[in-house]
């Protein structure tokens, strides 16, 4: 089995409350960690600089932040991680095994949502089915890909939202998308804030809107709550 170097790219914006916990998981790891700040107004940058390489890219959105991190990455493999998400302990082994597979261009992990609400377990099952049946993981599942393949694909499209969805749909044409048999654990904060089923409904409406050709900027405003009445 080949041994690859891995760069973890974490786009952030006002994540001071959680970024330290996220970065601590890499303290005893040999991976490169790049935090790409989008113009935080809190202590995110100061905290992150103690534990990772930090750059600031304002006004580019998450897609621009991830592309900037990828440009600077020194490793063979890129792994894009949300600021509120933890990887499984053996993620290096899993990433290496998957990208060693013939005709596999990229991968991601299953999803576990931090929270006791039983309905979250249903969401996890639905994510597992969508990811495995349709090879369609989302960004909160820690997408990983070789830097060479990422560059050849043109990186993430400059979209206000759905950049992960668009990217996966595009690279599926170049090879298989594999799902690692272990979950990342992501914060349940968004589900807790709006409620599990309302959050799920909003997510599905965003996808439908994207397929209908509604502009990503309008979809992003809807997702963030701007211009959205209580459902």
Which sequence ranges carry the predicted segments?
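Short aromatic/hydrophobic "clamp" motif used to bind/position activated sugar donors
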Residues: 78
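Acidic helix N-cap motif at the loop->helix transition within catalytic regions
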Residues: 17-21, 42-50
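Conserved donor nucleotide-binding strand/loop of the catalytic core
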Residues: 31-34, 45-72
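A conserved acidic beta->alpha catalytic loop
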Residues: 25, 37-45, 85
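Conserved donor NDP-sugar-binding/catalytic core segment of glycosyltransferases
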Residues: 89-119
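Hydrophobic helical membrane-anchoring modules
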Residues: 1-2, 169-231
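Short, well-formed alpha-helical segments that are part of the catalytic scaffolds
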Residues: 9-28
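Acidic donor-binding/catalytic loop of UDP-sugar-dependent glycosyltransferases
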Residues: 43, 83-97, 169
């Amino acid at each position: 089995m080949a041994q690859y170097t891995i760069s973890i790219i974490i786009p952030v914006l006002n994540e001071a409350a959680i970024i330290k916990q996220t970065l601590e998981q890499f303290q005893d790891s040999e991976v490169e960690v790049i935090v790409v700040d989008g113009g935080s107004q809190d202590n995110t940058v100061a905290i992150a600089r103690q534990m990772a390489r930090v750059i600031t890219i304002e006004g580019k959105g998450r897609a621009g932040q991830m592309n900037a991190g990828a440009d600077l990455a020194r490793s063979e493999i890129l792994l894009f991680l949300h600021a509120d998400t933890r990887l499984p302990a053996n993620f290096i082994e899993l990433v290496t095994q998957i990208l060693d597979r013939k005709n596999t261009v990229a991968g991601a992990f299953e999803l576990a949502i931090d929270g006791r609400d039983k309905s979250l377990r249903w969401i996890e099952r639905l994510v597992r089915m969508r990811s495995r049946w349709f090879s369609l993981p989302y960004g909160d599942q820690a997408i990983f890909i070789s830097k060479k393949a990422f560059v050849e694909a043109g990186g993430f499209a400059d979209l206000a939202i759905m950049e992960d969805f668009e990217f996966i749909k595009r690279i599926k044409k170049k090879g298989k998308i594999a799902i690692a048999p272990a979950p990342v654990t992501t914060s349940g904060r968004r589900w807790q804030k709006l409620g599990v089923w309302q959050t799920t409904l909003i997510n599905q409406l965003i996808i439908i809107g994207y397929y209908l050709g509604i502009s990503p900027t309008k979809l992003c405003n809807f997702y963030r709550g701007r211009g959205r009445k209580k459902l």
